[in-house]
């Protein structure tokens, strides 16, 4: 069942705003939600057909809520339901909607996405799932109530970089680490894991870091990502300045909570910008994220450029600059193991969906198998 319109959106704009927007340009009313000259130009052909622009703020089965120049409306998505799960209507999408008069009103098309968050699902059908669209900042929320899982942070970072958004790691519940020295060590650990990414300790209880975070999200669209119990809903309420999202306690033993947020909602921030809150992600499977993985492990990619062989896999090859860095202590072995793990996982996902890649992997396996057999025969003196 579709939910009712939620708090955080006006049911209608002022008559002067709506009138100006509908007669001239919708940008006046929708600018707070991210509408700009680029979207205006992209939408122009649809405006000529009498359609109206709107941004998807929540998706239900077969329907979605959109904010438009008329305010918040509900529309049917039957015309934009493709077989590809990565192309379905998603929170953050910009859409062309039928004008007032239709009952129900229909979404006729989606504008091309600038950025898109996708992960692999846990199903056996090797499908991707779209989490949010047209996002500028990815706020990866990590709770300090439990031990840091650096590998999980790397997964979220790979997903964020691959989407095209700028990641930011927020260490929530910073008040639970009262020792400044201990907190700085934790920040340094995450900074080492997240090169080129700002790491910000934040406490909704004390207000630490809230002003800095508010400044980051005040422009553009931000999405909150994190595991269940990471404190995303509490953080969302802090940024929104009111208790819009329900908050539930996390288990003390592992910091995991029940899903407070069950749908992806787009909400207007009081200081400017919009926020998409997502349900806690128990599974963070990669989806065609080779570029994102490379960005997360940029120091390894840099070292790889100095390897003797261009196809070095950084295991036992002679002249490998990456393994040499591990032996010298310049590169933590955990980083290399995590890098290998994510690359293998991503390759498996790509192979399941790309016949050409499957053929290349099979060919590589056969080549390595033949080389291994030749080496064994040479060792046993069977080659004449």
Give the predicted meaning of each segment:
Residues 50-60:
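Structural detector for short beta-strands of small beta-barrel domains
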Residues 129-134, 140-193:
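Phosphate-binding glycine-rich loops and their immediate beta-loop-alpha structural context
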Residues 176-230:
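Canonical P-loop GTPase G-domain recognition
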């Amino acid at each position: 069942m579709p939910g009712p319109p939620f708090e955080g959106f006006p049911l209608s704009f002022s008559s002067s705003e709506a009138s100006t927007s509908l007669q001239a340009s919708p940008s006046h009313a929708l600018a707070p939600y991210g509408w700009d000259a680029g979207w205006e130009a992209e939408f122009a052909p649809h405006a000529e057909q009498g359609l109206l622009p709107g941004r998807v703020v929540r998706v239900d089965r077969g329907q979605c809520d959109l904010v438009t120049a008329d305010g918040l409306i509900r529309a049917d998505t039957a015309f934009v339901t493709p077989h590809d799960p990565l192309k379905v209507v998603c929170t953050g999408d910009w859409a062309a909607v039928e004008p007032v008069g239709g009952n129900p009103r229909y979404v006729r098309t989606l504008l091309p996405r600038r950025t898109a968050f996708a992960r692999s699902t846990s199903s056996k059908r090797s499908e991707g799932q779209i989490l949010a669209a047209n996002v500028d900042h990815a706020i990866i929320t990590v709770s300090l109530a439990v031990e840091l899982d650096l590998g999980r942070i790397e997964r979220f970072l790979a997903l964020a970089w691959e989407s095209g958004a700028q990641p930011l790691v927020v260490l929530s519940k910073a008040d639970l680490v009262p020792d400044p020295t201990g907190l700085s060590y934790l920040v340094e650990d995450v900074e080492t894991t997240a090169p080129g990414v700002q790491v910000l300790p934040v406490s909704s209880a004390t207000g630490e870091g809230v002003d800095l975070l508010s400044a980051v999200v005040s422009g553009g669209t931000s999405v909150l990502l994190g595991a269940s119990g990471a404190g995303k809903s509490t953080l969302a309420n802090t940024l929104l300045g009111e208790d819009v999202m329900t908050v539930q306690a996390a288990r003390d033993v592992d910091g995991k909570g029940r899903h407070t947020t069950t749908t992806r909602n787009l909400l207007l921030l009081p200081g400017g910008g919009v926020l998409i809150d997502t349900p806690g992600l128990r599974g963070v499977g990669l989806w065609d994220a080779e570029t994102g993985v490379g960005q997360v492990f940029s120091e390894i990619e840099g070292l790889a450029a100095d390897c003797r062989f261009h196809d070095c896999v950084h295991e036992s090859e002679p002249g490998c600059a990456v393994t040499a860095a591990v032996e010298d202590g310049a590169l933590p072995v955990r980083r290399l193991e995590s890098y290998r793990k994510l690359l293998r996982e991503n390759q498996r996902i790509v192979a399941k969906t790309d016949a050409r890649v499957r053929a290349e992997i099979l060919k590589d396996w056969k080549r390595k198998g033949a080389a291994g057999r030749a080496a064994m025969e040479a060792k046993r003196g069977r080659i004449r």
